[in-house]
């Protein structure tokens, strides 16, 4: 059984997830207290939370409440980021800006997966591509993401640019990201 103290937060992973509103967080906390357990597991990769950051924060206030952890297997950090984006895109309450950011981030990360040719810890052949070997995939990252979300490649391109802009704004002015990716933008 995983202990709460063993769970780690990666800021990049957490930043892909739109935080719930105060009311939503409060309702989740009340539900957890009423049930006396966390109904949905916290999902991790190598001990880092990829889904369940809010549940984790609530559990830190009430460490006696039982919870479950499911460890996912991803071959790289990029695959974990793609999973986070896809998981978040499954939410019903996303604003158009949140959806655009996640689609852009997914496309950007899919490209990084394709361009990864191994490092000092992995063989290039394990990465799925070998340097100087042509990429034999029929469609590029944009067309793949566009097909997954029922949109056009040009929309995915604009979404990538939007996501890069949001991340640049966040780097320049911490907290600026919330203006574009949260309900506060309304």
Question: How would you describe each model-predicted region?
Answer:
Residues 180-186:
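Conserved small/polar residues in nucleotide/adenosyl-binding loops
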Residues 74-75, 139:
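Conserved aromatic
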Residues 91-179:
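Alpha-helical interaction elements
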Residues 1-72, 79-93:
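Short, charged/polar connector segments at secondary-structure boundaries
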Residues 72-73, 159:
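Residue-level "edge-of-site" marker
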Residues 14-17, 30, 39, 50, ...:
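Intrinsic-disorder/low-complexity regions
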